[in-house]
Amino acid sequence: MRRGLLSLLLTCALSPFVAGQPGTAGSGVITGRVRLTAPPPGNPIIRMGMDPRCAEATRGKRVVQDAVVTSADGGLANAFVHLAGSFPDAPRPAGAVTIDQHNCLYRPRVVGARVGQTIEFRNSDPTLHNVHGLSDASNEFNVGQPVKGQVFGFQLKREEVMLHITCDVHRWMTAYVGVVDHPYFAVSGEQGTFTIDAIPPGRHTIRAWHERYGTLTQSVDVAGGNTAVVEFIYTGSERPGPQR
């Protein structure tokens, strides 16, 4: 009996550790912040007079193209943060991701979604919008939405960081979708902070993308039951790659 127990314990001790498989030490968490150390540039003012309905919806408001949104201490919002690599055991997505067309702007401006997941565009304005996905990865679409309340759904086909969304009717309207084939992503909030949970233990490559400043990459070690902290720092000199 004792010999059998000893043999079982020895077998368990010598078994290889495989990240992401059921029965490992448990998942971990990555939390962190995206910062801009340079003074933020001024965002251009949007002139909506070309569409009377857009102009009426924003009357008396100063509407800007919020490409760079920072907190008082440099926290950078709207950065898409994600793990690189393949995670075949990750749970499949449930439900759709929604982007609203409200007051002639896309809201939110940056979202994340998974391959195979549906992204929905809702027209909340009493005017014609056109949802145009500019893709290099078979995620292309171009659909008119002339009626308030109309919803268009598209099932994302392939990974793409990032899928650029425009409106051919209102050229100032823009949004971005980070499409990955796993659930390990987040978008930085108003203070530049983000959290990604339920991550398989191990060493991972993590990336942050921002529409003005491009992509930063680093490695992070995640231990089961623990939280790893990372920080992405943009100096303001970075430039993104070509965008359609």
Kindly give the residue locations of the regions a language model identified.
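Positively charged n-region of N-terminal signal peptides that target proteins for export
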Residues: 1-4
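Bacterial N-terminal signal peptides
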Residues: 7-16
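Extracytoplasmic copper-binding redox domains, predominantly the cupredoxin/blue-copper superfamily
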Residues: 21-244
